[in-house]
Amino acid sequence: RDHGVPVWVHEADAGRARGEGKPPTAWGRVRPLPLLRFLGYAAGRGGLRTTYLREVRTFTAGERLPVPGAPLVVAMPGHSPGSVALHVPALDAVVVGDALTTRHVLTGEEGPRPAPFTDDPQAALDSLAALERLDARWVLPGHGAPWDRGTAEAVRHVRQVTPAG
């Protein structure tokens, strides 16, 4: 925003990015020490303050973004209505953002698992089927270390650690 760099978001999250509303989300399980670390880290970097955007560029699922690597936008609704993964076949990678995490910021648990602060946890789990079909080796989450055992194994692990609901 301050440097004139365009921000791209899925059309379903454009209003949220502009500050037009966000539903409250459940935190899920919490462990005190990881929670305090997360809050301390976030507070020290301005992460507890929201800065809204005046202008965003939007995309939809199935598009290829006009950036290096031409990533394919894959719908992953659940964390938010406009959550997406960006598949870059040339790199054998998929950027999943908060569709899943490999280090849960509120519990400290590691390995692929659902992300906290998710609007619709069941939709997020259902969206994993799209990720499973991508067949990329590298899964790059918004939180936690890169996962290099493939999308199918990441999804299997998430389902294994997620209680049936």
Q: Which positions does each model-derived feature cover?
A:
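Active-site gating loops and adjacent loop-to-helix segments of metal-dependent hydrolytic enzymes
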Residues: T102-P112, R159-Q160
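Active-site beta-strand termini and strand-to-loop segments that position acidic
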Residues: V67-G69, L86-A90
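Active-site-proximal beta-strand elements of phosphoester/diester hydrolases
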Residues: P71-P77, V94-D98
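Active-site metal-binding loops of divalent metal-dependent hydrolases
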Residues: E11-D13, H79-S80, D98-A99, H143-G144
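Active-site metal-binding motif and surrounding structural segment of the metallo-beta-lactamase
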Residues: R1-A14
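Divalent-metal (often Zn2+) His-rich catalytic cores of metallo-beta-lactamase-fold enzymes
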Residues: R1-H3, H87, A93, A123-G165
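Metallo-beta-lactamase
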Residues: A14-V74, T118-D119, A123-A136
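Short hydrophobic/aromatic beta-strand or adjacent loop that forms the aromatic wall/cage
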Residues: P81-A85
